UniProtKB/Swiss-Prot annotation:
Disulfide bonds join C32-C65, C36-C58, C44-C63, C48-C64. Coiled coil: none annotated. Residues 1-26 form the signal peptide. GO terms for cellular component: extracellular region. Keywords: Antimicrobial, Disulfide bond, Fungicide, Plant defense, Secreted, Signal. The gene is LCR81. GO terms for biological process: defense response to fungus; killing of cells of another organism. It is found in: Secreted. This is Putative defensin-like protein 80. Belongs to the DEFL family.
Length: 79
């Protein structure tokens, strides 16, 4: 009986591990990190700039950040 129970536990844990590795992840909202409202500090633009984005905008009551620039500000020229 213990061997059968152990195999069921192993199968159940394997299925759970499979879902954790491949499966459902919560939506990461790092592009929209805050809330827009008149009394909230810091404002959306300041929040996004402090996180390394180029700026921010309000989408309803959600503060969303502009995409980060793909160009580097420092360009190394070949010798």
């Amino acid at each position: 009986m213990d061997v059968q129970r152990s195999s069921y536990i192993f199968i159940a844990l394997s299925i759970i591990a499979m879902f954790l590795i491949t499966g459902v992840k919560p939506e990461v909202r790092d592009i929209c990190p805050g809330v827009c409202h008149a009394g909230i500090e810091p404002d959306c633009d300041t929040l996004c700039i402090s996180m390394g984005f180029t700026g921010g905008y309000c989408q309803g009551l959600t503060c969303c950040c502009n995409p980060k620039s793909s160009k580097s500000s420092i360009i190394n020229r070949p010798i």
